[in-house]
């Protein structure tokens, strides 16, 4: 099956698995999805991720994270830049999500970065999604 927007598909799979309190979600892998999973892990939104080698396409297994009383760590995921409407920001326009409580994931010339990292490096890019 051909997916028009693979990043939106990834976010939707994570959101659906999170809403049903699943521990694990499998997603078709790509380099960009692996980079987004790395950022989610670094920022503490997921426990871990693993690339599963299989034919014809590798899978990305994401282990979701919940608090000790069972509350979701990821309360929201939103796709910003879409194939039909790309959203780019300059270095001084990098957004803050919920006043700094969430993160914006950006695709920059230096790879996939969070909004904080992009501000520190002084670069803008394409706003892929918000996570809070």
UniProtKB/Swiss-Prot annotation:
Gene3D superfamilies: 3.30.1370.30, 3.30.1490.10
Name of a matching Pfam family: Ribosomal_S8
Keyword Ribonucleoprotein among record annotations: yes
Hydrolase as UniProt keyword: no
Keywords: Ribonucleoprotein, Ribosomal protein, RNA-binding, rRNA-binding
GO molecular function, one term: rRNA binding
Listed GO biological process terms: translation
Any one Gene Ontology cellular component term annotated for this protein: ribosome
Record-linked InterPro entries: Ribosomal_uS8, Ribosomal_uS8_CS, Ribosomal_uS8_sf
Family: Belongs to the universal ribosomal protein uS8 family.
Complexes and interactors: Part of the 30S ribosomal subunit. Contacts proteins S5 and S12.
Protein role: One of the primary rRNA binding proteins, it binds directly to 16S rRNA central domain where it helps coordinate assembly of the platform of the 30S subunit.
HAMAP family the record matches: Ribosomal_uS8_B
Entry protein name: Small ribosomal subunit protein uS8
Originating gene: rpsH
């Amino acid at each position: 099956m051909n997916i028009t927007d693979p990043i939106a598909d990834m976010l939707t799979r994570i959101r659906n698995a999170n809403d049903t309190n699943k521990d694990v979600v499998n997603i078709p892998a790509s380099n960009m999805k692996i980079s987004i999973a790395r950022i989610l892990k670094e920022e503490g939104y997921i426990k871990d991720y693993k690339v599963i080698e299989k034919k014809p396409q590798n899978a990305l297994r994401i282990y979701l994270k919940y608090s000790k009383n069972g509350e979701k760590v990821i309360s929201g995921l939103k796709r910003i830049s879409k194939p039909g409407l790309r959203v780019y920001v300059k270095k001084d326009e990098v957004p803050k999500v919920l006043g700094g409580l969430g993160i914006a994931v950006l695709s920059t010339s230096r790879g996939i970065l969070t909004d904080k990292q992009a501000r520190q490096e002084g670069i803008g890019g394409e706003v892929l999604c918000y996570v809070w």
